[in-house]
């Protein structure tokens, strides 16, 4: 049986997602992100184009590592302003039948008990088309604005995430038995208390004694995405994820990443072929190669170098403003997204990376 290619669109509820500066293009529509029709039109387009899903990114905080402030991110609309992604799902589901939705939501700042209810509600309303991109927040600005002095250390964030998932699994899978909902009009009994159980979770980070507030949804546990590519992040993905998102900058890096993920999945006792790996690709289309190249060059003319530096500085925790554009990158261990540094500076030794480009 031939293997299928799965296609997810990649969006964010903001003006500038991963192409900072393109909002200034005269044909750009991203400033309409505040309008419901923008999102329902996109959902219809993706369904008509046979896409499998729409993956919606998110951050809670601003990119303020570059020059020690958020001015570049704000002036260049580098993922700010940014609206909540969750509210987009239901209206897009209402105008489609098959399109899946991957919701990015950080577990760093929300207790699993109310979050479980949100996910189950979305699973009901989408009729089983919701997925969750499990992320641990990495922006220090987000932690500070929620009363924390700093983020947890990188690997500790995944320890916290492991327990978070255990609470959710207990709520989704163990609280309500199959057949707990009776809807018995004659006896006037809606649910059987004997088939609904308290989870009685007591752990290092959470104590959740009660039952899940939602009756079982179509999937119970939504499809789990994971985008961490550090060693600890890949171990977490191997234990939990059904879909792994990577952003490999070369075929060499991608081959290494996929092989490593599948090996770790097998070591975790799971079937590695049942874990889908999605790689980030930016595709520019044209009727001919020449027209596609011309369109690409046109788009590049709007690139904001300052906005791009704000993003990569936030992703890595390194102020790239201190480097020359032609300065070679070296591997640096940071507490932000470790994989962002590893991919550029150590994963592919055949390439030399600078702040602007790579050289073979």
For the regions a language model picked out, list residue spans one by one.
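N-terminal beta1-alpha1-beta2 module of alpha/beta enzyme domains
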Residues: 1-95, 219-222, 344
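Internal, glycine-rich beta/alpha segment that forms the wall or movable "lid"
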Residues: 3-4, 111-240, 267-268, 273, ...
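Active-site mouth loops of central-metabolism enzymes
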Residues: 23-36, 105-113, 220-231, 284-286
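Catalytic cores of nucleotide-enabled group-transfer and carboxylate-activating enzymes in metabolic
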Residues: 62, 81-84, 91-104, 226, ...
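Conserved small/polar residues in nucleotide/adenosyl-binding loops
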Residues: 358-359
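Hydrophobic faces of well-ordered beta-strands that scaffold small-molecule active sites
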Residues: 5-9, 54-56, 101-105, 130-134, ...
């Amino acid at each position: 049986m031939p293997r299928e290619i799965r296609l997810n669109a990649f969006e964010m509820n903001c003006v500038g997602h991963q192409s900072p500066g393109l909002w200034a293009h005269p044909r750009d529509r991203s400033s309409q992100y505040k309008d419901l029709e923008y999102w329902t039109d996109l959902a219809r387009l993706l369904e008509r184009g046979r896409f499998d899903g729409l993956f919606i990114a998110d951050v809670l905080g601003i990119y303020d590592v570059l020059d020690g402030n958020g001015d570049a991110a704000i002036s260049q609309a580098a993922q700010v302003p940014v609206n909540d992604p969750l509210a987009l799902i239901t209206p897009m589901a209402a105008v489609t039948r098959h399109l899946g939705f991957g919701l990015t939501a950080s577990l760093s700042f929300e207790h699993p008990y109310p979050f479980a209810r949100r996910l189950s509600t979305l699973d009901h309303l989408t009729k089983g088309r919701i997925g969750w991109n499990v992320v641990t927040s990495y922006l220090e600005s987000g932690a500070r604005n929620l009363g924390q002095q700093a983020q947890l250390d990188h690997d500790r964030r995944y320890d916290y995430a492991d327990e978070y998932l255990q609470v959710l699994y207990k709520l989704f899978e163990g609280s309500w038995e199959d057949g707990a909902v009776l809807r018995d009009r004659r006896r006037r009994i809606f649910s059987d208390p004997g088939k609904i159980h308290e989870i009685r979770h007591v752990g290092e980070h959470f104590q959740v004694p009660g039952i899940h507030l939602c009756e079982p949804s179509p999937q119970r546990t939504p499809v789990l995405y994971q985008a961490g590519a550090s060693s600890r992040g890949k171990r977490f993905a191997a234990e939990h994820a059904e879909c792994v998102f990577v952003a490999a900058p070369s075929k060499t890096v991608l081959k290494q990443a996929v092989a490593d993920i599948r090996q770790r999945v097998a070591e975790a006792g799971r079937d590695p072929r049942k874990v889908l790996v999605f790689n980030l690709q930016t595709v520019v289309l044209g009727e001919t190669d020449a027209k596609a190249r011309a369109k690409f060059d046109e788009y590049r003319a709007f690139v904001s170098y300052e906005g791009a530096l704000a993003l990569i500085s936030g992703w890595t925790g390194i102020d790239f403003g201190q480097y020359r554009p032609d300065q070679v990158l070296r591997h640096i261990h940071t507490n932000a997204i470790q994989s962002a540094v590893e991919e550029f500076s150590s994963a592919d030794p055949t390439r030399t990376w600078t702040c602007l480009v790579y050289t073979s």
